[in-house]
């Protein structure tokens, strides 16, 4: 039977084309449409599985003709390549088993299909493939195992419940489409977060800018703490998030609510780069936000600006512009205000270079800095508008919480009618307290807000029991489906020496297909900040001779972040290496298994030429490869279509036995031809430790 198109085979099988396509997909046979071709081997298999009575009789007739042949090898007949008459007559469909995601473990899968796990492992080992007890299976491998034992499987979700699409996705798509057209965008003020080590002057800097730059308040006005404020510099505005540090920054990132456009990293000139400086830098770098360094406390007698710059280079790889790099570094005194104006000008310069823009009108998207219950206003949210114009009377939604804007209060405590991009305001009018660090959207009507709210609540209820971040094994499984394979780590150790040794060893696990990105490393116990960063970056946390503090453990458990701790270096490296090696595509090698010689050629109608082979050495496998040599020259290289010993289909024949072999798509065989048999084996690849080549 030649190859056929899907619809042609469906016609022969008297099946609906769509039904056949579904069956093919379940069998793991890739087809694109009803016009796709199916190869000859698959056609024959499907005819045997689903064949009509007419085809069955044809196969039986072929079998009987095959049995009548007088030519023998060692006095025995060959049989039909697909097995016994009984098999042809029964022609039963394969057993069908439904599996769920929970069944994709070798032990559970084996139980499901009724085959002992040890037998599966042994059979695959004989084919040159290694399976381990209880190992995770992807759907492709599960189908391969099922096919080996004539079992059909179909995949179904364990929970047969309606999938509810998050309505906020559609709202986000609106903004995505708007951003694709530059004509829809307009320059907006940059939003700045100030980060740095404790006591390096973050709060002092923010207070100085606020006190000297915020516009004069009207008599009787009060300062309203809404988590951010705006200043004006040379006719342009800058919005500062009023809570210094990277905690809020990272929490917002973890919720997909990135508000920061520029980070000012404060480093004290008398103290240099400290652990929290490195931590803050890693948070900013992970978010791909531009960094300006403010070297503070230059008024101190022991201030050393040049030494601090050198530490920026050595510890953070931040090279100042004046040293040939691209990092803007401004020496300042936040206490005395020295060079703070220059810092503000540099912020505007970076903003101009970054082309920070937003949608100036229409529906609103705003980032929540914090939410709280106000004694006078009830549930309120302090936000920075990212896009659109927020107005009194707008219907709003933040996650599952809805509301209607009753009042807007700016950073000067004044009520305003509207707020545009990058403007910080307090929203009054939520029905209940919205989540901090979420996103607020405006919608057309109260009904729309209520509809979204109800759907989000339903989604959250369903996700609550399934909510978890990726474990190491799941990250690797995801990477298997991705072209770019990157494993992100947060690394903590007991000493700087241990940290350097571990970082060096991990970075030497090299592969073109998989990279390890240590997004943050530090000395000391695993903290809430580490968990927040891992949450925002889908990373796992590795600790060496350190523990996670109680708050970090609670947060990790709530967020589903995996923390793995070790006390022996090689155990950490060994486990990481083993996990990564499991992700490498195995190497395929050809291994010669034996040699044989054709003693007799049998011509069989509708089947072709069968080689009567005397095995000389080694063995031959049914699913193996073969090369045919005639007078020392290669005349054929391909696959073995069928292998028989006496009248039985067999998987393997060893020397010095005789056997019958049918070659795939090749009948021009002659007595005296020499055969070389081989198999393709998949060999697990190893990651190797390499010497750094000029890297630091």
From Swiss-Prot:
GTP binds at residues 196-203, 242-246, 296-299. It comes from the Bacteria. CDD domains: IF2_eIF5B (cd01887), IF2_mtIF2_II (cd03702), mtIF2_IVc (cd03692). Residues 296-299 are annotated as: G4. The keyword Cytoplasm applies. Keywords: Cytoplasm, GTP-binding, Initiation factor, Nucleotide-binding, Protein biosynthesis. It is found in: Cytoplasm. Its main location: cytoplasm. Residues 196-203 are annotated as: G1. Residues 242-245 are annotated as: G3. Residues 221-225 are annotated as: G2. Residues 187-361 form the tr-type G domain. One of its GO terms (cellular component) is cytosol. The keyword Cytoplasm applies. HAMAP family: IF_2_B. This is Translation initiation factor IF-2. The lineage of its organism: Bacteria, Thermotogati, Thermotogota, Thermotogae, Thermotogales.
């Amino acid at each position: 039977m030649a190859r056929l198109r899907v619809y042609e085979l469906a016609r022969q099988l008297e099946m609906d084309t769509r039904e056949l396509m579904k069956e093919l997909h379940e069998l793991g046979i890739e087809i694109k449409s009803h016009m796709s071709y199916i190869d000859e081997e698959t056609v024959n298999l499907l005819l045997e599985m689903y064949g009509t009575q007419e085809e069955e009789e044809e196969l039986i007739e072929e079998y009987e003709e095959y049995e009548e042949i007088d030519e023998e090898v060692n006095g025995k007949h060959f049989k039909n390549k697909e097995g016994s008459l009984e098999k042809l007559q029964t022609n039963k469909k394969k057993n069908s088993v439904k599996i769920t995601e929970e069944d994709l473990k070798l032990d559970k899968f084996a139980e499901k299909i009724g085959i002992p796990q040890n037998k599966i492992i042994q059979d695959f080992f004989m084919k040159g493939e290694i399976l381990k007890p209880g190992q995770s299976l992807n759907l492709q491998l599960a189908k391969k195992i099922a096919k080996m034992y004539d079992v059909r499987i179909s995949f179904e979700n364990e929970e047969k419940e309606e999938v509810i699409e998050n309505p906020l996705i559609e709202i986000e798509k609106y903004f995505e489409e708007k951003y694709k057209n530059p004509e829809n965008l307009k320059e907006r003020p940059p939003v700045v977060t100030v980060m740095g080590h404790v006591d390096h002057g973050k709060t002092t800097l923010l207070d100085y800018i606020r006190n000297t730059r915020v516009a004069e308040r009207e008599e009787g006005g009060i300062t309203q703490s809404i988590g951010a404020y705006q200043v004006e510099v040379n006719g342009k505005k800058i919005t500062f998030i009023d809570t210094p540090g990277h905690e809020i920054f990272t929490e917002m990132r973890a919720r997909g609510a990135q508000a920061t456009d520029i980070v000012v990293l404060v480093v004290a000139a008398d103290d240099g780069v400290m652990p929290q400086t490195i931590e803050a830098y890693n948070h900013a770098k992970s978010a791909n936000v531009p960094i300006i360094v403010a070297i503070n406390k230059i008024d101190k007698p022991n201030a050393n600006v040049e030494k601090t710059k050198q530490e920026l280079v050595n510890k953070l790889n931040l090279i100042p512009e004046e040293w040939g790099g691209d990092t803007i570094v401004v020496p300042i005194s936040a206490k005395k205000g020295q060079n703070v104006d220059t810092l503000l000008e540099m912020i505007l310069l970076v903003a101009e270079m970054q082309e920070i823009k937003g949608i100036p009108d229409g529906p609103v998207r705003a980032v929540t800095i914090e939410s709280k219950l106000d004694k006078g206003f009830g549930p309120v949210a302090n936000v920075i508008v990212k896009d659109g114009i927020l107005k009194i009377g707008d219907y709003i939604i933040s996650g599952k919480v809805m509301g209607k804007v009753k009042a807007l209060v700016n950073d000067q405590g004044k009520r305003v009618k509207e707020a545009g991009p990058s403007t910080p305001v307090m929203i009054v009018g939520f029905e209940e307290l919205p989540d901090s660090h979420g996103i607020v959207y405006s919608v057309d009507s109260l009904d729309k807000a209520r509809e979204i709210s109800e759907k989000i609540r339903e989604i959250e209820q369903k996700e609550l029991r399934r909510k978890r971040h990726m474990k190491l094994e799941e990250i690797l499984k995801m990477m298997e489906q991705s072209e770019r394979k990157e494993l992100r780590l947060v690394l903590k150790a007991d000493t700087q020496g241990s940290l350097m040794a571990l970082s060096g060893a991990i970075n030497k696990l090299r592969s073109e297909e998989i990279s390890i990105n240590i997004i943050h490393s530090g000395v000391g116990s695993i903290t809430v900040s580490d968990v927040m960063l891992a949450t925002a970056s889908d990373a796992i946390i590795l600790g060496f001779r350190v523990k996670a503090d109680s708050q970090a453990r609670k947060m990790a458990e709530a967020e589903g972040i995996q923390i793995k701790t070790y006390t022996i270096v090689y155990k950490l490296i060994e486990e990481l290496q083993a996990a990564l090696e499991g992700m490498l595509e195995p190497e395929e090698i050809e291994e010669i298994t034996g040699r044989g010689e054709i003693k007799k050629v049998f011509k069989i109608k509708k089947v072709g030429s069968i080689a009567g082979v005397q095995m000389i050495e080694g063995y031959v496998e049914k699913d193996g490869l073969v090369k045919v040599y005639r007078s020392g020259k290669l005349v054929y290289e391909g696959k073995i279509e069928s292998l028989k010993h006496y009248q039985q289909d067999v998987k393997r024949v060893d020397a010095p036995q005789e056997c019958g072999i049918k070659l795939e798509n090749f009948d021009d065989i002659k007595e005296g031809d020499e055969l070389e048999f081989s198999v393709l084996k998949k060999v697990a690849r190893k990651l190797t430790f390499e010497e750094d080549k000029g890297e630091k």
